[in-house]
């Protein structure tokens, strides 16, 4: 045998495309052997349905026509039983009868079209593949209904052009290699090539997204006469025609077919476009008309009534975009929640440049920003934070709400600038390198003095290489009265179990996270408009929330004054009163960001109180906070470099390590304000009644250089005592807590011990430390 014959004998036939494939190109994981190309084209999750559809059509077609091969050869050892003469004659008679029926259907179809041509009669049309029996059509329709319930792929509005006769089924039946035989006069060669890449976009999308087996019959005659009804495959029809009866209303062209895109409006309950009507309920109408062309054409137009509203089923790209938007917003809210939860501890741990920059910027929030190319697109910056990856420098992170009042949170300037660009230009493909040169901020609300955000936050400031520019560049805080609820309040409200007595009640169900993003969104309507009753309920809750915010503004002022935000003027004789805490245990009734418009933000006031206390107690750096530093470091596994392991500190705080007993707050002149402060405040400058002292020698500790046991918060040691303990235990072996105890790590029985690098830092050259890599 020749090499070509050997190669052809090794090839297998794909069940779908019926092409000879090498064994390595075949996949045997499904009910039929299929090639990798078909699996990649249809998708592994839908290939079984396509195989089942092809199987039903092959059975109804009467085995394999047009010289199609019967598929892969039988396995070795299986004998093929030859048909008897009687069975062969019966099969031949059945095939001949079916061919006559198909010719009759083709003649009737050409008579209906009114544009019969010799070329069309000579070449078999692509529609002859649809000659199914009634039983097969019913079975295929049932399978299609089941498939729609499983996958529910809403197709985009489809226009069936003049090449509808040459459109191919997704299972690739109807001719050699699964494609129909084009006639010489059926159009340009681009339309007759019939490869998946060169087929029309409408047919390709319909065959990929709207794959349904079975036929849709009963459509009226395009000519309006009483001739036979058209038989159109369902993958070439919009999904709205498959789920409900058609009415006789003439509809405007859908979006993308010459019609202008109007503003989307919510639909009433049960109307097309509502969430319960996806897929096309009764009321969605379609018209089928004929267009004068060389071949027959069927144009289906989908709409909702005569008002020009959007159809109930939107394209899958819109749905994917909305899903990605919800996921992005949820991730941004999670980052915001994490930032707020650990802000009090982590900010105090950061270097002085980082801390000062964050304090300065936090004192300016919230302030408005807009898109440079379209001034109607407004958002607001409401929070800042500093993040760092291991081995990297700190980088500024800002949280922006866009549109204003929507609850949509973006954790980067480039993200919000990209969304603004898409809303402005309707271009979803372009990405922006840096959002700071596309955003402008208003220095003072109402002044019209808009400046580039990149001038306020240049790259040197964003990486904390330089300080914030002068005061003439800083914006003034402005809280819009029409939407006073900031996303930080939504995050804190989601964690607050109840409102303290005497301070007003929380609304019954404040939407948080994704719920807030969907119910407060103003940028564009969701592709699934909410039910009118739900929207009315959410609107009522929003009004109640805003009214509650307005009523509690005075309470916030009293809380700030009574809770220690005026602590710089507090007498040094008594312990300072605790401020409203930040974090997951906060029960405040009013979010901190809804403070008076011209006053400092509560976060900035809290940090200024900490700085003031650090100046009073520390002979060293006046701006550092020793107690906050120690409390933030007490859960760190490294007493020297605690900032490198923030994850363990957070884990310890979640495991309940922070539930310390704290003295009750001092009496307040305003009843009802005392319950605002929880009783489980972590170890902080407000909770410590005295200065930090060494556990062994009881001497005052330096605010930045001392050893903290990560297991026992009260174990704090100065460097001299730690050095003596390390020498006594032996620096070359395991060195445990300087207290003499083997303090177990959080959540385990393993005792905590110094690392070799920590020992070397504490000893500072007094004793040669054995390196971990030394033999």
Curated annotation (Swiss-Prot):
EC number of this enzyme: 2.3.2.27
Main location, first listed in the record: nucleus
Biased composition, class Polar residues, residue ranges: 586-600
Reaction(s) catalysed by this chain's protein: S-ubiquitinyl-[E2 ubiquitin-conjugating enzyme]-L-cysteine + [acceptor protein]-L-lysine = [E2 ubiquitin-conjugating enzyme]-L-cysteine + N(6)-ubiquitinyl-[acceptor protein]-L-lysine
Zinc fingers, RING-type class: 694-741
Modified-residue entries (Phosphoserine), positions: 69, 195, 498, 526, 618, 636-638, 641
Protein's job: Probable E3 ubiquitin protein ligase involved in the proteasome-mediated ubiquitin-dependent degradation of target proteins. Through the degradation of CTNNB1, functions downstream of FOXF2 to negatively regulate the Wnt signaling pathway. Probably plays a role in the development of the central nervous system and in neuronal maintenance. Also acts as a transcriptional regulator of genes controlling female reproductive function. May play a role in gene transcription by transactivating GNRH1 promoter and repressing PENK promoter.
Name of this chain's protein: Probable E3 ubiquitin-protein ligase IRF2BPL
Organism for this UniProt entry: Mus musculus
Organism placement in taxonomy: Eukaryota, Metazoa, Chordata, Craniata, Vertebrata
């Amino acid at each position: 045998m020749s090499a070509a014959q050997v190669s052809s004998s090794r090839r297998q036939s794909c069940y779908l495309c019926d092409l000879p494939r090498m064994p390595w190109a075949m996949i045997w994981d499904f009910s039929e052997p299929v090639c990798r190309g078909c699996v990649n084209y249809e998708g592994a999750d839908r290939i079984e349905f396509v195989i089942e559809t092809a199987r039903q059509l092959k059975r109804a077609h009467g085995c394999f026509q047009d010289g199609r091969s019967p598929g892969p050869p039988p396995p070795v050892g299986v004998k093929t039983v030859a048909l008897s003469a009687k069975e062969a004659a019966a099969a031949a008679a059945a095939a001949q009868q079916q061919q006559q029926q198909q010719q009759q259907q083709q003649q009737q179809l050409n008579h209906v079209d009114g544009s019969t041509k010799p070329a069309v009669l000579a070449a078999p049309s692509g529609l002859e593949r649809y000659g199914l029996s009634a039983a097969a059509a019913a079975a295929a329709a049932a399978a299609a209904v089941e498939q729609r319930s499983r996958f529910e792929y809403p197709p985009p509005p489809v226009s069936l052009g003049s090449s509808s006769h040459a459109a191919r089924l997704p299972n690739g039946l109807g001719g050699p290699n699964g494609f129909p035989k084009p006639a010489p006069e059926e159009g340009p060669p681009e339309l007759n090539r019939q490869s998946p890449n060169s087929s029309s976009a409408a047919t390709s999308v319909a065959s990929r997204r709207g794959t349904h087996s079975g036929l849709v019959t009963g459509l009226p005659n395009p000519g309006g006469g009483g001739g036979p009804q058209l038989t159109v495959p369902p993958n070439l029809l919009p999904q709205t025609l498959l789920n409900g009866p058609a009415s006789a209303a003439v509809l405007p062209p859908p979006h993308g077919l010459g019609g202008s895109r109007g503003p989307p409006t919510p639909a009433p309950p049960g109307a097309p476009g509502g969430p319960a009507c996806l897929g096309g309920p009764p009321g969605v109408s379609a018209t089928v008309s004929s267009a004068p062309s060389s071949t027959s054409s069927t144009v289906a137009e989908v709409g909702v009534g005569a008002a020009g509203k959007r159809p109930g089923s939107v394209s899958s790209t819109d749905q994917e975009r909305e899903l990605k938007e919800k996921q992005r917003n949820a991730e941004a809210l999670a980052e915001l929640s994490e930032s707020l939860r650990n802000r009090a501890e982590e900010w105090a741990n950061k270097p002085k440049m980082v801390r000062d920059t964050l304090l300065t910027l936090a004192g300016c929030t919230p302030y408005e920003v807009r898109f440079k190319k379209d001034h109607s697109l407004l958002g607001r910056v409401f929070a800042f934070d500093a993040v760092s990856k291991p081995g990297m420098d700190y980088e500024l992170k800002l949280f922006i709400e866009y549109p204003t009042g929507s609850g949509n949170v973006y954790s980067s300037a480039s993200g919000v600038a990209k969304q603004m660009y898409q809303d402005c230009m309707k271009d979803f493909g372009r990405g922006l390198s840096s959002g700071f040169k596309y955003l402008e901020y208003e220095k003072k609300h109402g002044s019209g003095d808009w400046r580039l955000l990149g001038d306020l936050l240049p790259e040197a400031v964003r990486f904390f290489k330089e300080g914030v520019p002068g005061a003439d560049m800083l914006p003034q805080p402005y809280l819009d009265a029409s939407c006073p609820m900031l996303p930080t309040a939504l995050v804190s409200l989601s964690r607050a179990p109840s409102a303290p007595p005497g301070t007003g009640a929380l609304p019954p169900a404040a939407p948080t996270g994704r719920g807030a993003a969907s119910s407060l969104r103003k940028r564009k309507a969701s592709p699934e408009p909410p039910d009118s009753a739900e929207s009315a309920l959410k609107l009522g809750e929003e009004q109640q929330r805003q009214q509650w915010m307005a009523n509690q503004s005075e309470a916030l002022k009293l809380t700030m004054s009574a809770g220690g935000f005026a602590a710089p003027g507090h007498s040094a004789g008594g312990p300072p009163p605790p401020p409203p805490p930040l974090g997951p245990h906060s029960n405040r009734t009013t979010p901190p960001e809804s403070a008076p418009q011209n006053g400092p933000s509560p976060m900035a006031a809290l940090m200024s109180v900490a700085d003031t206390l650090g100046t009073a107690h520390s002979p060293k750096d006046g701006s550092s906070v020793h107690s906050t530093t120690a409390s933030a470091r007490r859960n760190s596994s490294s007493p020297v470099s605690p900032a490198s392991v923030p994850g363990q500190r957070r884990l310890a705080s979640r495991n309940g390590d922070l539930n310390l007993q704290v003295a009750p707050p001092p009496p307040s002149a305003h009843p009802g304000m005392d319950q605002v402060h929880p009783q489980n405040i972590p170890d902080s400058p407000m909770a410590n009644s005295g200065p930090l002292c060494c556990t062994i020698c009881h001497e005052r500790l330096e605010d930045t250089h001392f050893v903290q046991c990560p297991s026992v918060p009260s174990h704090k040691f100065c460097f001299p005592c730690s050095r003596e303990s390390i020498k006594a235990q032996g620096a070359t072996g395991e060195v445990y807590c300087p207290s003499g105890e083997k303090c177990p790590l959080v959540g385990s029985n393993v005792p905590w011990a110094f690392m070799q690098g920590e020992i070397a830092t504490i000893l500072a050259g007094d004793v040669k430390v054995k390196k971990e890599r030394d033999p």
